[in-house]
C-alpha cells in the first residue's frame, strides 16, 4: 500500500502564515525560536497545562529532528500545530518526557559504542549520560518539591 501524504506542504505553509511564524517547510535544521514555540504552545495548550517554554521548545525540536531524520516517518510534515500536539501529548504523560528520552537515547548510544569498542565514544556518551541523568534527577526533585 502506498501511504498518502496526509499533511500537504501547502497546508503547512498556510498554517505558518496564519500563525505569523517562519515557513516550517523550509527548515533545514530542527531549530525553533522561543517566540515561535510560544505561539505554537498558545494554540495547542487549551487546558493551560503548566509547561515550561524552554522544555516545549526543546520538545518541538526533538519531534522536528525525528521527522527530518526519518523522512518516511514524518507524520506531521513539520506542521507546527500537529508537531506541537505531539509534544503536548508527551508532556501529558510526563513533564519530564524529553529529559527521560534524552537519557534513553544516550543509553542506547552508549551500548552501541561499547559494542563497537570505541573508547573515545564510550567516554563521551558516558559523560553526556551522567549529565542528562543529573538534569533529569534535578527536574524530578523540583517537581516533587525537594
Residue ranges of each PLM-predicted region?
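Charge-rich, solvent-exposed alpha-helical interaction surfaces
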Residues: 11-18, 39, 43, 125-128
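Histidine-centered active-site/metal-ligand motif
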Residues: 17, 63-66, 89-90
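Charged, low-complexity interaction regions
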Residues: 24-25, 48-50, 71-76
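Flexible, glycine-rich loop/tail regions that form catalytic "lids" or insertion modules at the edges
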Residues: 32-70, 81-83, 107, 125
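Amphipathic alpha-helical packing elements
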Residues: 74-109
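Short linear, low-complexity motifs centered on an aromatic residue
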Residues: 101-124
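Long amphipathic alpha-helices with heptad-repeat character
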Residues: 110-111, 122-139, 143
Amino acid at each position: 500500500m502506498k501511504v498518502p501524504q496526509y499533511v500537504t506542504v501547502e497546508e503547512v505553509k498556510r498554517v505558518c502564515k496564519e500563525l505569523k511564524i517562519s515557513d516550517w517547510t523550509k527548515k533545514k535544521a530542527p531549530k525553533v525560536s522561543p517566540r515561535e514555540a510560544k505561539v505554537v504552545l498558545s494554540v495547542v495548550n487549551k487546558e493551560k497545562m503548566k509547561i515550561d517554554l524552554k522544555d516545549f521548545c526543546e520538545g518541538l525540536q526533538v519531534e522536528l529532528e525525528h521527522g527530518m531524520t526519518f523522512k518516511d516517518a514524518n507524520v506531521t510534515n513539520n506542521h507546527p500545530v500537529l508537531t506541537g500536539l505531539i509534544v503536548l501529548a508527551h508532556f501529558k504523560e510526563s513533564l519530564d518526557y524529553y529529559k527521560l528520552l534524552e537519557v534513553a537515547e544516550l543509553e542506547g548510544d552508549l551500548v552501541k559504542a561499547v559494542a563497537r569498542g570505541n573508547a573515545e565514544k564510550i567516554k563521551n556518551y558516558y559523560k553526556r549520560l551522567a549529565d542528562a541523568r543529573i538534569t533529569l534527577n534535578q527536574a524530578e526533585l523540583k517537581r516533587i518539591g525537594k
